UniProtKB/Swiss-Prot annotation:
Family per similarity comment: Belongs to the SDA1 family.
Record's subcellular location: Nucleus, Nucleolus
Identification of the protein by name: Protein SDA1 homolog
UniProt organism field: Mus musculus
Modified residues (Phosphothreonine): T552
């Protein structure tokens, strides 16, 4: 009977659904029967929308599954569900509300609903106190917008949704506003909505009175999540074979040099494709897309001065302001005195505050404003009453500030800090040396003569520009090296012809001809010519090359290497003996933001205290096996033997026994035999 009942189509919706999908015209009557049943159930439900209805939920999902089969009959079905959700979403049963949303998502996936109206409805449903529903809607919104912009940017839909989200961010419901912000941030990170409008909508969230929204917006601009995801090798969205697929294919196939070469080639191609697919990212690109960074930074500073949030939130605000000022080179003079109040060694997170002060420094800030900041750091940190670590942090901070704003450093302060080169603490000494080395490249004339080092071409050319001065050159510095290299190549060609003719003559005699043309000798010849050439002639040659030809990437690389060579020649000590070093061309360029390591850098590792050393030692023993052999009983529930009882017996009960009294009176021979037996027994046990 049960099998027969299962074949009854009106009561078995999954079977009917399967048959309709196979042949829709053949089952129109059965569909209309269910559709009328659905309409009657819907009318009853509208009278009491707060009551659950399992039958209605099944019918709604059935209609959604076959929506594409009868579009003329179900043309009003999506709108009915949307109206029901928009008017009654607060009173609906959670399970039924989830079913209606899933039905709409199913219809949207079949492209039977307009995306704009549906997404607006889903944003309104984010106000519901249903965590599972909010998570489902969030996933669908992100995926749907990604699919809309998959082939090309659909600006028409994007503009409508962005405007709607802008209103949602100002919504009184904190949950809905936070979810809307999360959607925008996720879409920006996936490079779907990576335009300036999205970024400037997110900037409004930085002034929200709701802490969660404020922190989410600040975290986005500070780029913490980008840094975490930057090094991930695989993404769920990437199509095509992965490195694992290629390795499995090689492991299961025939081994051989030919297949190995194929694998290596495939891995190279895969790596190249991944690089192409990877979006071009520069440091914290969202900050670069802000329309009016000056006004934004001023508003943030005003908010920071009256902020009553936790200390961590204040630190995030300070960090964002300092990044804005440093990257956009803004004028925010009130920020420096505000930061100056916190520059005390006992201040919580003082190294981060020093980092913010360094980030906010740039060459357009008047030097007198940064000078007061430098003096505060020097007076509070770089004094003998402080520990070596505090002094090191202070000198490192001064070095980073002056690297960005060299005019702020006075000659008197620099000479005082240079005296710490001979300090007893190694960290302080090395930090002072790095500061001296910085000014050897920036302006050696500010240092005392003994600290300037050997004068070289790079140090002679070094000069700090005056405040507001522009150093506009009509040539590419260092381009004269290309002219000299060209001359060397022509000479080499002539020598080559001569050596070739000589070798032809001497081949008959059977003698070898030694030809000496190494890259080191060429470098040496070019460097010698450069040294002998006056400065005016160099500039003229560089200007002639810059205006007469189009430079290639190789030419720029040669110029860069030559400029780096000048700085390498200025290095003291052992590097001076080896003049013609091979310079690493892959040197990493310095980013536009500082890291905390630049401030906290200690050249000598501090000693660990007893607790730290003990914790490290105990952590190393976790995986160590015990070397004592445990005695195992055949029956673990059996009682202890007489021998074990004897060992555990109280001595006061044993002191008058014959064994104890005779043990002390044993002869040397008895002791010798007892020792032998014990050793033999121990050896057996070790086996």
């Amino acid at each position: 009977m049960s099998g027969r009942n299962n074949n009854k189509l009106p009561s078995n919706l999954p079977q009917l659904q399967n048959l309709i999908k196979r042949d829709p015209p053949a089952y129109v009557e059965e569909f209309l029967q269910q559709y009328n049943h659905y309409k009657s159930n819907m009318e009853i439900f509208k009278l009491q929308p707060n009551k659950p209805s399992k039958e209605l939920a099944e019918l709604v999902m059935f209609m959604a599954q076959i929506g594409q089969c009868y579009p003329e009959h179900l043309s009003n079905f999506p709108q009915e569900l949307k109206d029901l959700l928009s008017y009654n979403h607060t009173v609906l049963d959670p399970d039924l509300r989830m079913t209606f949303c899933k039905a709409l998502i199913l219809l949207r996936n079949k492209n039977l609903i307009n995306p704009s109206s549906l997404l607006e409805l889903f944003f309104e449903l984010l106000r519901c106190h249903d965590k599972l529903l909010r998570k489902t809607l969030y996933t669908h919104i992100v995926t749907d917008i990604k699919n809309i912009n998959a082939k090309h940017k659909n600006n028409k839909v994007n503009v409508v949704l962005q405007n709607f989200m802008y209103t949602m961010l100002r919504d009184s419901n904190a949950t809905a506003a936070k979810m809307s912000l999360d959607v925008m941030i996720e879409l920006y990170r996936r490079n779907i909505w990576n335009d300036a409008k999205t970024v400037n909508v997110i900037t409004t969230a930085c002034f929200s009175k709701i802490t969660k929204i404020l922190v989410a917006a600040l975290t986005f601009f500070l780029g913490k999540d980008e840094e975490e995801k930057q090094d991930s090798d695989s993404e769920s969205e990437d199509d095509g074979p992965t490195a694992r697929d290629l390795l499995v294919q090689y492991a299961t196939g025939k081994k051989g040099s030919k297949n190995k070469k194929k694998l290596e080639k495939a891995m190279k191609v895969l790596k190249k494709q991944k690089k192409k697919k990877k979006p071009e990212v520069f440091n914290f690109s969202a900050i670069h897309l802000i329309h009016d960074p000056q006004d934004f930074a001023e508003k943030l500073l005003k908010q920071l001065e009256s902020c009553k949030e936790r200390f961590e939130v204040k630190m995030m605000l300070m960090n964002l302001i300092s990044r804005l000022v440093g990257i956009h080179e803004l004028f925010l003079f009130n920020f420096y005195p505000f930061v100056q109040r916190f520059l005390q060694p006992h201040q919580r997170e003082v190294t981060k505050i020093l980092l913010f002060a360094a980030q906010a420094s740039h060459h357009l800030v008047p030097p007198e404003i940064i000078q007061s900041l430098l003096v505060t750091v020097a007076n509070n940190f770089v004094t003998d009453k402080n520990s070596g670590e505090v002094m090191t942090v202070g000198i490192n901070a001064i070095k980073e500030i002056t690297a960005r704003c060299p005019l702020a450093m006075t000659e008197e302060l620099l000479q005082d800090l240079a005296q710490y080169k001979t300090h007893k603490d190694k960290n302080v000494m090395m930090s002072a040396r790095t500061l001296i080395h910085l000014f050897r490249t920036l302006n050696p004339q500010m240092l005392q003569k003994k600290f300037r080092g050997k004068p070289t071409e790079a140090s002679i050319e070094a000069r700090i520009q005056e405040y507001g001065e522009l150093d506009a050159k009509d040539y590419i510095p260092g381009a004269e090296v290309l002219e000299l290299e060209k001359g060397e190549n022509t000479e080499d060609d002539e020598d080559g012809w001569e050596s070739a003719s000589l070798s032809e003559e001497e081949e008959e005699d059977g003698e070898w001809v030694d030809v000496h043309h190494s890259s080191d000798e060429e470098q040496q010849a070019i460097a010698t010519k450069l040294d002998s050439m006056p400065m005016e002639e160099r500039k003229a040659k560089a200007a002639a090359i810059s205006t007469s030809r189009v430079l290639t990437q190789d030419d720029f690389q040669k110029i860069r290497m030559a400029q780096m060579k000048k700085e390498m020649d200025a290095a003291p000590g052992k590097a001076q003996k080896r003049k013609y070093l091979e310079i690493d061309s892959d040197e990493e360029s310095r980013g536009e933001l500082l890291s905390l390591r630049d401030i906290e850098r200690l050249h000598k590792k501090p000693k660990s205290d007893k607790e730290t050393r003990l914790a490290t030692a105990m952590a190393g023993r976790t995986d160590r096996k015990e070397f004592v052999r445990k005695k195992t009983k055949i029956n673990p529930f059996s009682s202890s033997t007489n021998k074990e009882k004897k060992k555990q017996k109280n001595f006061m009960m044993m002191r008058y026994s014959q064994n104890v009294r005779s043990k002390s009176a044993r002869s040397f021979r008895d002791k010798q035999l007892a020792l032998r037996d014990a050793l033999l027994k121990k050896r057996k046990r070790m086996k």
